[in-house]
A protein has these predicted regions:
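A donor-sugar binding/catalytic signature common to diverse glycosyltransferases
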Residues: 1-20, 146-193
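Short, conserved active-site loop motifs that form the nucleotide-linked donor/cofactor pocket
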Residues: 24, 45, 136-137, 206
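Short, contiguous acidic/charged loop-to-helix segments that flank catalytic cores in large enzymes
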Residues: 83-88, 112-115, 162-165, 184-189, ...
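Conserved catalytic-core segment of nucleotide-activated headgroup transferases in glycan assembly
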Residues: 50-144, 152-154
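Active-site-proximal binding-pocket segments
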Residues: 139, 165-167, 200-203
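Conserved small/polar residues in nucleotide/adenosyl-binding loops
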Residues: 209-218
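Active-site-proximal region of nucleotide-activated glycan assembly enzymes
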Residues: 3-63
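Acidic, glycine-centered active-site loop in nucleotide-sugar glycosyltransferases
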Residues: 178, 193-206
């Protein structure tokens, strides 16, 4: 595309627009980019009327996670984040642990990937600095099928999104499983993916632009 193989070129999906000067359009929607975004893009932003992304559902299998197998009481509140480690940062983790601290009978589940040791260390260190026992942090291993992964999301009462790199596929899966989700809305494409998906699903009560609001509501 950099050599202009077509008279009109557009990009879509991915992390954001490419910035390549030979690209004419970047496909977006009313929510995934803020109103003033055109000031910062070399391409013409082409906003579809509702959403830039649509799916027709997901296959879901039988879950292989149970609260009792993880030592979680039946009346506990379970928070879950299914993002990879590179989407975490100290500020997001601090906020997640503050939420956990405000809900005494709660647990935080997170997915284990290749970077799980570093992520576990960050989560445990932050939890301990907030006076939270590491027993309330439970790593969840990878599964063989995406259908099982989606089914396992059902163990959560609330899914906590990451910021400034939101979920995308994981957000769609969460919505498909009808699980409440809390996200923070930023000014960049990657920080507004969950926002546009939730808005298009008619959900507006758990999208925030301010950290304190995110923490207080939860």
């Amino acid at each position: 595309m950099a050599v202009k193989v077509a008279p009109i070129q557009a990009t879509w999906l991915g992390w954001d627009a490419s910035g390549i000067p030979t690209i004419d359009y970047f496909i977006a929607d009313p929510y995934v980019l803020p109103e003033n975004a055109q000031d910062y893009y070399p391409h013409k932003i082409w906003r579809l009327p509702q959403t830039y992304l649509a799916v027709d559902g997901f296959e879901v299998a039988i879950p292989n996670l149970k609260r009792e197998d993880l030592g979680i009481p039946s009346d506990a509140v379970v928070y879950f984040t299914a993002q990879r480690g590179y989407k975490y940062n100290p500020h997001t983790v601090r906020l997640q642990m503050k939420i956990l601290k405000e809900v005494p009978k709660s647990y935080f589940l997170f997915k284990k990937f290749g970077d799980s040791d570093l992520l576990s260390e960050l989560l445990i260190d932050t939890a301990e600095s907030e006076g939270i026992s590491s027993d309330r942090l439970i790593p969840i291993g990878e599964v063989s099928l995406e259908e099982i992964h989606r089914a396992n999301l059902g163990i959560a009462d609330i899914v906590l999104d990451t910021y400034p790199y939101n979920g995308a596929t994981t957000t769609l899966e969460t919505l498909w499983m009808c699980i409440p989700m809390v996200t923070r809305v930023g000014q960049q494409f990657a920080a507004r993916n969950s926002y546009t998906m939730m808005m298009n699903a008619g959900i507006t009560a758990v999208s925030y632009t301010h950290l304190r609001a995110h923490e207080t509501e939860t």
